[in-house]
């Protein structure tokens, strides 16, 4: 499996850190996807984006010689998760809708891109595509998703001791006293007017 390595992102794109080393999609686990992502800057409409690349190997196949649909859906879910690097909140997948436009053969590289469509209170809406061979190649997969903001304690409760998230100890992040209200607000609302509760 290959991806956008931490040192070889596209020209002008900033490599993004992985979530944690044991992540099935972005960690370095045997049989995992080993995805890496980069920030190319905002799209033409000024919206935050992420990009990446994924080469399908034998552990990722469904039908003989083709990528499993669940593998491609997992890649899209992780791509959307990488968009969180643009935000001051953490989110979990609430809903993921994936469309398959063309088969993805083993050995083929899928070029991934995603954009934030909307942040509305706790809700984050995103969309993305996976294209064959080049970033402008034929569309093989597309997806939309709804993510929901959660406190870091959501992850601390289940994570093994010593787990790091984006390069920092999860236990420290989970006990942060910063208010989520500081980051999650309605359009036009002054975050200083929010009270903890």
Regions flagged by a language model, labelled:
Residues 53-55, 97-99, 113-115, 129-131, ...:
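Residue-level recognition of well-ordered beta-strand positions that form the cores
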């Amino acid at each position: 499996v290959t991806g956008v390595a931490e040192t070889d992102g596209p020209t002008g794109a900033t490599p993004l850190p992985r979530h944690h080393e044991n992540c099935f999609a972005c960690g370095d686990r045997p049989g995992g996807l080993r995805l890496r992502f980069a920030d190319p800057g905002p799209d033409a409409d000024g919206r935050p984006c992420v990009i990446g690349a994924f080469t399908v190997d034998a552990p990722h196949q469904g039908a003989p010689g083709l990528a499993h649909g669940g593998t491609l859906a997992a890649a899209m879910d992780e791509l959307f998760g990488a968009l969180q690097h643009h935000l001051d909140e953490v989110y979990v997948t609430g809903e993921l809708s994936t469309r398959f436009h063309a088969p993805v053969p083993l050995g083929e590289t899928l070029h991934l891109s995603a954009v934030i469509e909307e942040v509305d209170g706790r809700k984050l809406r995103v969309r993305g595509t996976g294209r064959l061979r080049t970033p402008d190649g034929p569309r093989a997969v597309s997806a939309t998703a709804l993510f929901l903001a959660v406190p870091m304690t959501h992850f601390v409760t289940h994570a093994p001791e010593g787990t790091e998230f984006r390069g920092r100890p999860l236990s420290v992040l989970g006990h942060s006293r910063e208010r989520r209200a500081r980051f999650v607000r309605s359009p036009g609302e002054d975050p200083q007017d929010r009270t903890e509760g």
